[in-house]
UniProtKB/Swiss-Prot annotation:
Name used for this protein in its record: Putative competence-damage inducible protein
UniProt-listed InterPro entries: CinA (IPR050101), CinA-like_C (IPR036653), CinA_C (IPR008136), CinA_KH (IPR041424), Competence-induced_CinA (IPR008135), MoaB/Mog-like_dom_sf (IPR036425), MoaB/Mog_dom (IPR001453)
Pfam family, one: CinA_KH
PANTHER family in the record: NICOTINAMIDE-NUCLEOTIDE AMIDOHYDROLASE PNCC, NMN AMIDOHYDROLASE-LIKE PROTEIN YFAY
Organism field: Streptococcus pyogenes serotype M4 (strain MGAS10750)
Family: Belongs to the CinA family.
Annotated Gene3D superfamilies: 3.30.70.2860, CinA-like (3.90.950.20), MoaB/Mog-like domain (3.40.980.10)
CDD domains with a match to the protein in the record: cinA (cd00885)
Source organism superkingdom: Bacteria
Length: 423
């Protein structure tokens, strides 16, 4: 099946907004086994939109239009598609009720006649309810071509796609089952090299590597009758892949850390902290609180994290953490001594089970004769204080800080997994 995405809106063409819907929809279609062959952006112009719809209908089986469902005159998507399909626009009862409920709480003058357009669907469509907005979406098949209309705002589009469109398409088309494997500590080029025979000879399941910032994912996919068969096929392939070794001889399973498109090292670490009822603190220099803010972004973070320190300068490291200033000057802030001292003092001062520290050179200039991207990460527990040195070269300041936090979370994760193996 060939799909085409059409983004409607002059603001996309003028660069006022970024078309993030295209990426989201492409991922969702891939999960369903639907191939997106074309992506188009067109302005709020009926003639040009008609031309784009005509072209899409000649080359695609599924046409998804995003944007242009609002109440204003330049919101033309449903009207133009209805004209192309030679169908009337009718009112969806549920969408009309939502308009009534919405404006019942507002001044009567706020409900202008053009608002009613948002409750219209093309005659013969399956309405796609909009839980977070007023403009109803729709799905219709005419002459073997399926058309979808969706609102433009991502906050409205995503719930409709996840809760309405994906289940609808799943019933109509064969389902693609996928499993995403996540790796940290290996680059995409090496991972592809190690698995080259699998990738070059793949049929079903398929293997698709993706490079992320600081990590790599593999999407394993198969088309089959049900989830149980898919789990069996994907599980067998996963076991074969993870049995391979890196070019350094390290088991690939050692750099694999979890599953899922929306998973992360931080989430895996947080869940282990909760599982083992361990508290954590941090003292951060170059990352300036990024580790702690990431940790605090998870609901329930207060179970494991009460607070920490941001000590950017040498003087603040001495003042807030109680580290000897002369020793800091002697060893330098970019050193194992400083990283270990920061982690241990943070742990002792807060009473946490685990203390983490990050200190180094975000760049672009050198510091203490250390190149940009040099980072020391400390970790302290009741039984041990240690540190690692990593070099994150050729990256921006933001990437250096982000990847440094990944290393820190991975260090904590491995420590907690050792605890798990002892139980």
């Amino acid at each position: 099946m060939k799909a085409e995405l059409i983004a409607v809106g002059t603001e996309i063409l003028t660069g006022q907004i970024v078309n993030t819907n295209a990426q989201f929809l492409s991922e969702k279609m891939a999960e369903l086994g639907i191939d997106v062959y074309f992506q188009t952006a067109v302005g709020d112009n009926e003639e040009r939109l008609l031309s784009v719809i005509t072209t899409a209908s000649q080359r695609s089986d599924l046409v998804i239009l995003c944007g242009g469902l609002g109440p204003t005159k330049d919101d033309l998507t449903k009207q133009t598609l209805a004209k192309y399909l030679r169908r009337d626009l009718v009112y969806d009862e549920q969408a009309c009720q939502k308009l009534d409920d919405f404006f019942a709480k507002r001044k009567p003058s706020s409900r202008t006649p053009n608002n009613e357009r948002q409750a219209q669907v093309i005659e013969g469509s399956i309405p796609l309810p909009n839980k977070t907005g007023l403009a109803v979406g729709g799905f219709i098949t005419v002459d073997g071509i399926s058309y979808v209309v969706l609102p433009g705002p991502p906050s409205e589009l995503k719930p409709i796609v996840n809760e309405e469109l994906v289940p609808l398409l799943s019933k109509q088309y064969s389902t693609l089952y996928s499993k995403v494997l996540r790796f940290f500590g290996i680059g995409e080029s090496q991972l592809v090299t190690v698995l080259s025979d699998f990738i070059e000879n793949q049929t079903d399941p398929t293997i698709a590597p993706y490079a992320k910032t600081g990590e790599v994912t593999l999407r394993l996919s198969t088309k089959t009758e049900n989830q149980a068969l898919a789990d069996k096929k994907l599980g067998q392939l996963e076991a074969q892949l993870l049995s391979r070794k890196t070019l350094e001889g390290q088991p690939l399973a050692d750099v694999f850390y979890g599953y899922g498109e929306d998973n992360s090292l931080a989430r895996e670490t947080f869940e282990l902290l909760v599982k083992y009822d361990k508290s954590i603190t941090a003292a951060e220099s170059l990352t300036a609180g990024l580790f702690q803010s990431t940790l605090a972004s998870f609901p329930g973070a207060s179970q494991v994290f009460n607070g920490g320190f941001v000590t950017y300068s040498m003087e603040e490291k001495a003042k807030m953490l109680g580290l000897p200033l002369e020793e800091l000057k002697s060893h330098g802030v970019v050193s194992a001594y400083t990283a270990e001292g920061m982690a241990e003092q943070a742990r002792l001062l807060t009473g946490a089970d685990i203390g983490v520290s990050l200190t180094g050179v975000a760049g672009p200039d050198m510091l203490e004769e250390q190149p940009a991207g040099t980072v020391f990460i400390g970790l302290a527990t009741q039984n041990k204080v240690e540190s690692i040195k990593v070099l994150i070269s050729g990256r921006s300041r933001l990437d250096v800080c982000y990847i440094a936090t990944l290393h820190a979370f991975n260090m904590v994760r491995k420590t907690l997994l050792k605890l798990e193996n002892l139980l």
